[in-house]
Amino acid sequence: MGTVHARSLDPLPMNGPDFGSPDDADLVEVEPQKKQEILENKDVVVQRVHFEGLGRTKDDLVAHEIGQVFKAKNLIEVMRKSHEAREKLLRLGVFRNVEVLIDTCEGEDAVPNGLDVTFEVTELRRVTGSYNTMVGNNEGSMVLGLKLPNLFGRAEKMTFQFSYGTKETSYGLSFFKPQVGNFERNFSVNLYKVTGQFPWSSLRETDRGVSAEINFPIWKTSHTLKWEGVWRELGCLARTASFTIREESGHTLKSSLSHSMVIDSRNASILPKSGALLKINQELAGYTGGDVSFLKEDFELQLNRQLTWDSVLSTSLWGGMLVPIGDRPSSIADRFYLGGPTSVRGFSMYSIGPQSEGDYLGGEAYWAGGVHLYTPLPFRPGRGGFGDLFRTHFFLNAGNLCNLNYGEGPGAHLRRLAECIRWSYGAGLVLRLGNIARLELNYCIPMGVQSGDRICDGVQFGAGIRFL
């Protein structure tokens, strides 16, 4: 974290205003000089804000981020708002480092209680590279990236990324443009090619596409509007692929419009202790071109509550439905899949529901729910350090995946979704990898197994970001 320096000011008293939790205490450092007037509880005026180190960054971009500093009325507010402005500047992704210096005003126009705030910034290089690893849903990948940050001086960036994974290889070029003064409102365009292998379906899929999306907040919700055009090539992964998979092979062109809404009040995205998450997605394909037509809806709900002894009770519910439009049936590439260590544990990856000769075909409707209890490790080894990354995990999962006859009514649909419910229970260990991903090692007992389901009875390992 950066440091807020204040010159020509006496140190704050030990019983001064609260700066927040002890974890935030190192965010503010005061460098005093002796025999100066104490301004802590007196009104002050921020007369000038200076920037040192600006090169290609435009003035209007940074001016919007530091506007609140001028509204500060006392020293404490100046320091708080300066730190908040620093965080906003770093969020733009155009500076490597930002330091804040607070000093008394000097010069003919200086007033006795006037302050100058100086932001010392270091811009990123015009071209940066990166190498890292990424964890997906039970998949790992190596990612190489090349980025052109702050391309035109207003936080635009262009990124080229190549990813090589255990089941997927991709590369793409993207352009990102935020709205000046409102970083949450942004626009992006992407060109990409993705080749994936899906052994549970004996399927190989290659997507070549372009997409454009707009992100914007409304009150406490975040929204995304997206158009995507994809040329999809489906093929058999093995000679033993079923005849149904061979029928699905070939080329399709999908053009779709989608909208997603997210409400997230959780205190963390990985292993939260409190708060809730709601995601709702809609996708409409066919009305903007292409030879694939459908309406797709799905949602995700998660609730978390902290209990005694640092335990957390978490409940989650997923669901979705795909309705083909016209006479053409849905494609295997658009259907839902269920099962595996990240959804209904105790079953193999995406190995629940309709199948043909051992190849899983997905379904047009599904639901899945889970109840989880996370507790600290017994006897709390490594408490306050590495041991806090581990949690004991007890779970109960259930769900179903099927195809619906849309000539029937909603009552028949609900009855079909309530039939043949798969469920499982078990316990294990969870490891949190920062705020990026998590690993699970569980002992699972699958129940409600139906003919054709592939189970994982016993120890099951899972890695990913999104878990039921």
UniProtKB/Swiss-Prot annotation:
UniProt GO cellular component terms: mitochondrial outer membrane
Stretches assigned to the POTRA domain: 44-124
GO biological process assignments: cristae formation; mitochondrial respiratory chain complex assembly; protein insertion into mitochondrial outer membrane
One protein family per Pfam: Omp85
Subcellular localization, per the record?
Answer: Mitochondrion outer membrane
Is Cell cycle a UniProt keyword of this protein? no
Region annotation Disordered: where it falls in the sequence: 1-24
Q: Which InterPro entries match?
A: Bac_surfAg_D15, D15-like, POTRA
Mitochondrion in keyword set: yes
Its quaternary organisation is: Associates with the mitochondrial contact site and cristae organizing system (MICOS) complex (also known as MINOS or MitOS complex).
Q: What is known of its domains?
A: Its C-terminal part seems to contain many membrane-spanning sided beta-sheets, that have the potential to adopt a transmembrane beta-barrel type structure.
- Record's family? Belongs to the SAM50/omp85 family.
What's this protein's name? Sorting and assembly machinery component 50 homolog A
Organism, by scientific name, is Xenopus laevis (African clawed frog)
Quote the gene name from the UniProt entry: samm50-a
